[in-house]
């Protein structure tokens, strides 16, 4: 898969193009460009490290939305020995923007739920661009209760611009579906680990985002609104999205500092899409480590810790 370069990655694209040109020029035995290629590769590594060392919040937002970024099903395929997807909310329909089911990770049974976007036009429409409707959140709730019934740990993967705001979704109770999930997840009697793998957009993300641990990939985002939406409201100008991204504090590093995220998982240089296999293995190792810790905690203590965790959000000291 050829990388889809973002605007701030243009120096990287230029260097990689030069390397490709040299390779094409060295097709004959009389031409040896190994030294030049090595020099360019060294320069590429240095330049890439420089660019990704100090990304702005807006640049991180672009990476979180990268069209080649791994989605929930990609991670499931990498991490799970086996996986059986379950469909439908048993009331209205099957929302393809939410996927979930039963799986095994290194033989350990788990329930997995996550947002799912599409790759091409057809699948993007089928997945509604990763924006769930009420039936998607009710499907997720069905799987949550299944996890509780069979005492299986729950893993959720968050990657959505937000819940779908269409008229039909509102008529079918979008806000109620999200609110119910928040309430039910707070009381699930099994370990729950939530991971932001891409975009974490407002209530659409929170509806599968309440748990005992909140993990976040290095170039993910988590916010009450998109930078463009925030800019349109505050400055009446979507072009000020860069400023809005900084003000929203939506990056993993910032949220970890605020105590809203427990662990930031480092991505491969250039982002998860540059090496999805490596990212999947790294995420798997972290999840298994967190599960080992949580499964040692008695249920009553787990519930109390989760309650105290949720009550701590937004707390401040002052006169």
Swiss-Prot record:
According to its UniProt entry, this protein's organism is Xanthomonas campestris pv. campestris (strain ATCC 33913 / DSM 3586 / NCPPB 528 / LMG 568 / P 25)
Q: Does the keyword ATP-binding apply?
A: yes
Signal peptide range in chain numbering: none
Q: Cellular component GO terms, alphabetically?
A: acetyl-CoA carboxylase complex
The GO terms describing molecular function are: acetyl-CoA carboxylase activity; ATP binding; carboxyl- or carbamoyltransferase activity
Cite the annotated pathway.
Lipid metabolism; malonyl-CoA biosynthesis; malonyl-CoA from acetyl-CoA: step 1/1
| Entry annotated with the keyword Lipid biosynthesis | yes
Instruction: Tell me how this protein assembles.
Output: Acetyl-CoA carboxylase is a heterohexamer composed of biotin carboxyl carrier protein (AccB), biotin carboxylase (AccC) and two subunits each of ACCase subunit alpha (AccA) and ACCase subunit beta (AccD).
**Domain of life of the native organism:** Bacteria
Primary enzyme class? transferase
Could you tell me the EC number(s) of this protein?
2.1.3.15
Question: Biological process (GO) annotations?
Answer: fatty acid biosynthetic process; malonyl-CoA biosynthetic process
Compartments, record wording: Cytoplasm
Task: Outline what the protein does.
Answer: Component of the acetyl coenzyme A carboxylase (ACC) complex. First, biotin carboxylase catalyzes the carboxylation of biotin on its carrier protein (BCCP) and then the CO(2) group is transferred by the carboxyltransferase to acetyl-CoA to form malonyl-CoA.
- The CoA carboxyltransferase C-terminal domain covers 32-293
Q: Which keywords does the record carry?
A: ATP-binding, Cytoplasm, Fatty acid biosynthesis, Fatty acid metabolism, Lipid biosynthesis, Lipid metabolism, Nucleotide-binding, Transferase
Q: Which HAMAP family does UniProt cross-reference here? A: AcetylCoA_CT_alpha (MF_00823)
| Listed name of the protein | Acetyl-coenzyme A carboxylase carboxyl transferase subunit alpha
Family, per the entry?
A: Belongs to the AccA family.
Q: Which reaction does it catalyse?
A: N(6)-carboxybiotinyl-L-lysyl-[protein] + acetyl-CoA = N(6)-biotinyl-L-lysyl-[protein] + malonyl-CoA
